[in-house]
């Protein structure tokens, strides 16, 4: 007799809840924050933790300030900055005083590189950033390419394989023909618990939505 359809493993609770809104674009700030903090139980979606002052070191701090404040707001942590110091109330989540400043200071530089080593696409070719689910129900960071990138794709050899990178971290290669069909890049969130994967996916989405920072930024003090 014919066997029945293969049963998929139970979907993690966070992924099941996330399916209600499978693609969350970062433009919908409240929704993205609720998904990140509420669904994954990563923390509370409002800034209700400790008040903190984060001092950044950077030669470009005047140019980076707007992006740093935007990243903080995307996390659900409205912030103000005076010079190099940001004042904000942290989200109510474990190790926030360590994790949040590190996230804010990440470069957020996208590179999509052709086999000869030359970059084909960068942050300027991003149309929209989202958190999505892959076929296994796990969170991924998804980028839609803009009209300029789509026009460029038409001129490339369909069999070329491109290497996507975020801040030098390499992700699975993608064939040009796939991008010609669907001009989207998907960045897997790695291994571990669904909540950890969701945090990685959301972190990457935040730094790409508000990036890259115009120079290297580091943390000099957190109080």
Predicted features along the sequence, with ranges:
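A structural signal for conserved, well-ordered secondary-structure elements
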Residues: 2-223
């Amino acid at each position: 007799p014919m066997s029945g359809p293969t049963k998929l493993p139970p979907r993690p609770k966070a992924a099941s809840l996330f399916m209600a809104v499978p693609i969350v674009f970062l433009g919908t700030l409240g929704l993205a924050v609720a998904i990140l903090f509420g669904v994954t139980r990563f923390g509370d979606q409002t800034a209700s933790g400790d008040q903190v002052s984060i001092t950044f070191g950077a030669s470009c701090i005047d140019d980076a300030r707007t992006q740093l404040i935007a990243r903080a707001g995307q996390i659900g942590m409205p912030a103000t900055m005076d010079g190099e110091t940001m004042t904000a109330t942290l989200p109510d989540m474990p190790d926030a005083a360590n994790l949040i400043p590190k996230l804010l200071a990440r470069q957020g530089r996208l590179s999509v590189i052709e086999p000869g080593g030359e970059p084909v696409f960068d942050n300027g070719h991003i149309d929209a950033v989202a958190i999505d689910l892959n076929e296994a129900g796990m969170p991924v960071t998804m980028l839609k390419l803009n009209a300029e990138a789509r026009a460029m794709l038409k001129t490339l050899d369909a069999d070329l394989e491109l290497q996507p990178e975020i801040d030098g971290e390499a992700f699975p290669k993608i064939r040009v023909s796939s991008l010609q069909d669907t001009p989207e890049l998907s960045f897997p969130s790695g291994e571990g618990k669904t909540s950890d994967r969701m945090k990685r996916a959301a972190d990457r989405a935040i730094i790409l939505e508000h990036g890259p920072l115009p120079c290297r930024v580091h943390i000099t003090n957190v109080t």
